[in-house]
């Protein structure tokens, strides 16, 4: 066997691949043109307001004194009706209308020594009321007042003694508390038309000689004042009869509380 002659293979030279010339990418930068910030300042024109001079202040008129502003009742000046309910709401809170026993003024004048005796420190009534006195009356003065009271009290009719003692006690208590009495006025129909509505003062008709109507007085008191008044009256009704040896009825002719008014 003849060996197969191997022809040498011709090696084809590999041509080097010419790389395509890469065109350099030239960056095309966009020219960033800076925006010129031109501040446009607004011209601040100061607005000068014309200064107007203020008008000269007029001095306030001097008001007259307070006592000259008060209306005189004798001149029949109308008074404001709006102030009356307001004053009643402020003052009349839980007030009870108490009827004061009415006796003839001559009887009260006759029992004036008894009233003075009850007002002094030598009386247990005055001690219960704790009336402030700078000095105590002498024993001789108390003895004189006691004798005068015991001389006048028996001269009053027995059926009027109870109301008389209560009347002087009421006058003492009301005088100490500086309360204003509210007196009812009963007027005939003929003279009632003479009153002017909205007026501060009015003329109280004088009762005729044949018709002398005695209207009892009344006053508005608080509950604790009523209790003090009852206690004082009870002491006086026990003190004067024992001191003067005079019979004084302990019953009441007129009820104490006749009406109740409650303030808003």
UniProtKB/Swiss-Prot annotation:
Keywords: Seed storage protein, Storage protein. The keyword Transmembrane does not apply. Residues 1-15 have a biased composition (Low complexity). GO terms for molecular function: nutrient reservoir activity. SMART domains: AAI. Residues 1-66 are annotated as: Disordered. InterPro entries: Bifun_inhib/LTP/seed_sf, Bifunc_inhib/LTP/seed_store, Glia_glutenin. Developing endosperm. It comes from the Eukaryota. The keyword Transit peptide does not apply. Residues 16-44, 52-64 have a biased composition (Pro residues). Sulfur-rich seed storage protein. Belongs to the gliadin/glutenin family. This is B3-hordein.
């Amino acid at each position: 066997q003849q060996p197969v002659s191997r022809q040498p293979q011709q090696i084809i030279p590999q041509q080097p691949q010419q790389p395509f010339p890469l065109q350099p990418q030239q960056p095309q930068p966009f020219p960033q043109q800076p925006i010129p910030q031109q501040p446009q300042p607004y011209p601040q024109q100061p607005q000068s307001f014309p200064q107007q001079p203020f008008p000269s202040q007029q001095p306030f008129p001097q008001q007259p004194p307070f006592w000259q502003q008060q209306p005189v009742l004798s001149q029949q000046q109308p008074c404001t009706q709006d102030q009356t309910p307001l004053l009643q709401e402020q003052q009349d809170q839980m007030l009870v209308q108490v009827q004061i026993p009415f006796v003839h003024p001559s009887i009260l004048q006759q029992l004036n020594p008894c009233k003075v005796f009850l007002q002094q420190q030598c009386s247990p009534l005055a001690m219960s009321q704790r009336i402030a006195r700078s000095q105590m009356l002498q024993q001789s003065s108390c003895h004189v007042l006691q004798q005068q009271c015991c001389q006048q009290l028996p001269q009053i009719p027995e059926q009027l003694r109870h109301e008389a003692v209560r009347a002087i006690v009421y006058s003492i208590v009301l005088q100490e508390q500086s309360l204003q009495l509210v007196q009812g006025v009963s007027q005939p129909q003929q003279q009632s038309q003479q009153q002017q509505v909205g007026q501060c003062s009015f003329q109280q008709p004088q009762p005729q000689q044949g018709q002398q109507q005695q209207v009892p007085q009344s006053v508005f008191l608080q509950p604790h004042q009523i209790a003090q008044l009852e206690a004082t009256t009870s002491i006086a009704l026990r003190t004067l009869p024992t001191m003067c040896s005079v019979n004084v009825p302990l019953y009441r002719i007129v009820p104490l509380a006749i009406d109740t008014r409650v303030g808003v």
